Amino acid sequence: MSVIDQNAIAVGPRISEADVGDYIALLKPRVMSLVIFTALIGLLIAPGHFHPVLAITSLLCIAVGAGASGALNMALEGDIDSLMSRTANRPIPRGRVTRQEALAFGITLSFFSVLTLGILVNWFAGALLAFTIFFYVVIYTLWLKRWTAQNIVIGGAAGALPPVVAWAAVTGSIAPEPVWLFLIIFFWTPPHFWALALFRTDDYARAGVPMLPVVAGPDATRLQILLYTIVLVAIAAAPWPLGYFDAVYGVVSLALGAGMLWLAIEVFRKRDRIPSLRANRKLFGFSILYLFALFATLGLEAIARMIAPLIW
């Protein structure tokens, strides 16, 4: 037997070590949970009756589409993930799943989610979901993230689309209400992720990702966080006086906005290392609570309107 034959036998075909948990990790469950939540609010506030089976189908398809995007993102960012401590334990850097397996998994789920939503619900929603996946995978992952400090600003559009897709699933159209939801998430994304990037700057620099703190420095990032937070608070409060959302939402948005703005000011003010790290972490954590509470208020208002005729 030749040396080549012996080597071929020794190497052999790679046997995947992945288990179910690894494939679940590819879906980015935390991101999926946020997508499902914001999409659910889009469904709840949409006008008209929507059959529960179609509602569940829509949420499932949007969730699977988000998971597909996550899997494709990990497949295309395996080189970056392996260099960052925050992502080094993901399935691909650990060698549990190959990039080819993740690509196949993500592509399969993408087609399944889009086709199922289009066939069973409506093709407008299916097309929006397809665009969301495309934008996240191609525009953000392959282009923006690697080449510009505005990566999460422009790329944030993908994360802001799920409630729009959900509204379209119910109505087959787009209206001002889902556009407001889109804008809230869009302007929420930069302060949220830049706060994370401020205490993960070394991680991003090591991986060569041009996040704003790496490219422009922490002071410029703090200013941008404050400016985007001011816009976010204004955008989030605007639907109330304009008549799109109720007064309860308006009061909650102002209260949450005050907290968000205060923490953004703290991030801007505190420049020493330890106080700065604490301020960044507080803003990052509160921003999650901010978005959840804001959207939950809309959802609870919608549920209250649904059950009011049954009570009175």
Swiss-Prot record:
EC number: 2.5.1.141
Family: Belongs to the UbiA prenyltransferase family. Protoheme IX farnesyltransferase subfamily.
GO molecular function, one term: protoheme IX farnesyltransferase activity
GO biological process: heme O biosynthetic process
Membrane-traversing stretches: 34-54, 56-76, 119-139, 152-172, 179-199, 225-245, 248-268, 283-303
Record's keyword terms, sorted: Cell inner membrane, Cell membrane, Heme biosynthesis, Membrane, Transferase, Transmembrane, Transmembrane helix
Name of this chain's protein: Protoheme IX farnesyltransferase
Subcellular location per the Swiss-Prot or TrEMBL entry: Cell inner membrane
Miscellaneous remark of the record: Carbon 2 of the heme B porphyrin ring is defined according to the Fischer nomenclature.
Pathway(s) this gene product operates in, as recorded in its UniProt entry: Porphyrin-containing compound metabolism; heme O biosynthesis; heme O from protoheme: step 1/1
Signal peptide: none
InterPro entries named in the record: Protohaem_IX_farnesylTrfase, UbiA_prenyltransferase, UbiA_prenylTrfase_CS, UbiA_sf
Catalysed reaction equations from the record: heme b + (2E,6E)-farnesyl diphosphate + H2O = Fe(II)-heme o + diphosphate
Uppermost EC category: transferase
